[in-house]
Every structure is written in structure tokens, then in C-alpha cells.
Design a protein with these regions (language model features):
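Histidine/acidic-residue-rich, glycine-tolerant segments that coordinate divalent metal ions
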Residues: 4-127, 132-136
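Metal-dependent amide/peptide-bond hydrolase catalytic core
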Residues: 98-277
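DPxDG-like acidic metal-binding loop motif
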Residues: 1
Length: 277
């Protein structure tokens, strides 16, 4: 207890840790803020950090914008069911869904050529479900995916272009296609300039030449519901690089692992950033 009291007396700032639920479904930050996570007293700064395994030992901070705009989409393709022995009486939703997937792939290829200033972007599908049985023409297919873009105007243009493509597929296949966005977009956020300068000094001190200051060209097409915190106060997003040599498994891969030797260095860096505020 005495040691804890001594540390509290010597620590130069008041610190609050946020353990956020529901981050992966984009709801955590909203719920935390509704519960007063940055109030009483009001937070003067917000720090967040991730670990990544695409590079070995290091620390990375983005200059300015630090995330992308993203949203999940759901595409419903409605056809008409019939027996395959009477195929002329049905409308194949699976065939139309295949056209949708092809259109999304083509959009990724063509959009950048038509919009050279679009920046990084991607449209993708993660799941597809449809059909009842082998001898039945499917009357409904659902595709779930996402739109991601560095620039908000690019995100909006991609959404509109995809909608136009879906309307064309409707005409060609006789299906009805509806695209929905079950939730609001996750907007991009930017690192505070002063906090970024602090991170540069600390990063070089702790990690030496393994500290990386990244620009928009290196921006990852990821988003985070933490943008809501950045709207409330100045913030800094830091990535600690902890890849294991020879085991470069990407995010959300079942074999994703971190080199835990990064942990004391990341704690030291965070401590020095906090005590500099």
C-alpha cells in the first residue's frame, strides 16, 4: 500500500484506463462515452495503441490521419424459386450474386483508374449465404462485406458506383437487389500534432531506428470506433510492431501471434508519452 501511495504521489498526471467492450461490432466507444468514460474529470488527452505482426520489433505513428473510413454492407439478391427441371420458371439468385461478386472485383480494379486521386480503398465480401437444396433454384442470397477508403469522398463515390452496378445487374438478371448498411459508418480520425511530436521523441528514445513515422501512403485500410473519442479530445494512436520472424500471419488469422518481447518496450514508451503530457 505504501509503495502504491508513493507512486500515486509521484505520477504527474491523472490516468484512466478504458477497457472497451463490443469494439469489434463498432459499439464499444459509443457505449463508453454514454457512460461518461471521458468525464469527471474531463480527459485532456486520449491515447490508444494496437499491436501488429506485419513487421518485427518497432513502433509506428501516423503523421495526421491515422485511420480510414469503413462500414459493413449487406446485399440481398432476390430471385424466384422453382425446380431445376423447370428452370425457365425460376430466377437464379445465385447466378445474380455471382455477378455481384464479379462487379465488386471489377470495381476495385477500375475505380482507381477513373479516379487517380482516390487514395487507398477496397470493397470486399466476407460471407455469402443462399439456397435451400441441390434441385431448387435459389430465390434469395445474402452477401455481407465492407467498404473501406482513406478519403470520405472516395468512400461515398464507391458506395454510389456500387449501387449503380447493382441496378445494372438487376436489369440483366431479372432479380431484385437491395444494398443495406445496418450501422453508421466508422469515420477516420487523426493524431494530434503535439502528441505526435511527443511520440516521435519517445519513439526514437525507446526504439531507436525502429521507430517509424508514417504518412498517408502507409495508411492501413482499417477503421476503429475509437474515432468517437478523438471527437471529444485530442488523441494519439500508436502501433507497436511485434511480428515473429518467419511467422507473418495477418490480422484475424487463427495463427496470429505476437513477439511478447515487445511488451516492456511498449509499456516504457506509453509511460514516457503519458508523463510528458
Amino acid at each position: 500500500m505504501a509503495e502504491e501511495q508513493r507512486m500515486q504521489e509521484n505520477f504527474p498526471v491523472r490516468l484512466r484506463f478504458l477497457f472497451e467492450p463490443a469494439e469489434e461490432i463498432g459499439e464499444g466507444a459509443k457505449r463508453m462515452l454514454q457512460a461518461g468514460a471521458l468525464e469527471n474529470p474531463k480527459a485532456d488527452a486520449f491515447l490508444m495503441f494496437h499491436y501488429a505482426a506485419d513487421m518485427t520489433f518497432g513502433m509506428a505513428v501516423h503523421q495526421g490521419q491515422a485511420s480510414s473510413m469503413i462500414n459493413s454492407m449487406q446485399i440481398h439478391v432476390h430471385g424466384k424459386s422453382s425446380h431445376w427441371c423447370e428452370a425457365d420458371k425460376g430466377i437464379d439468385a445465385i447466378y445474380a450474386a455471382a455477378q455481384v461478386i464479379s462487379a465488386i472485383h471489377d470495381l476495385n480494379e477500375s475505380f482507381g483508374k477513373q479516379h487517380p486521386d482516390a487514395g487507398k480503398y477496397i470493397v470486399g465480401t466476407g460471407t455469402i449465404h443462399g439456397g435451400e437444396y441441390t434441385n431448387i433454384i435459389a430465390d434469395h442470397v445474402v452477401l455481407n462485406g465492407n467498404i473501406r477508403a482513406v478519403h470520405e469522398e472516395t468512400y461515398t463515390a464507391l458506395e454510389h458506383e456500387l449501387e449503380r452496378n447493382l441496378q445494372e445487374i438487376e436489369k440483366q438478371t431479372g432479380t431484385q437487389i437491395r444494398m443495406e448498411f445496418p450501422k453508421d459508418p466508422v469515420y477516420a480520425f487523426a493524431n494530434d500534432e503535439e502528441l505526435t511530436e511527443t511520440a516521435k521523441v519517445v519513439g526514437a528514445e525507446v526504439f531507436g531506428d525502429k521507430f517509424v513515422l508514417e504518412g498517408e501512403d502507409e495508411l492501413f485500410l482499417s477503421g476503429d470506433n475509437a474515432y468517437r473519442y478523438f471527437r471529444e479530445t485530442r488523441g494519439l494512436f500508436t502501433v507497436f510492431l511485434a511480428g515473429i520472424p518467419g511467422e507473418n500471419h495477418p490480422l484475424h488469422h487463427p495463427k496470429f501471434q505476437l513477439d511478447e518481447r515487445i511488451l516492456p518496450y511498449s509499456v516504457e514508451a506509453l509511460y514516457k508519452i503519458i508523463t510528458t503530457l
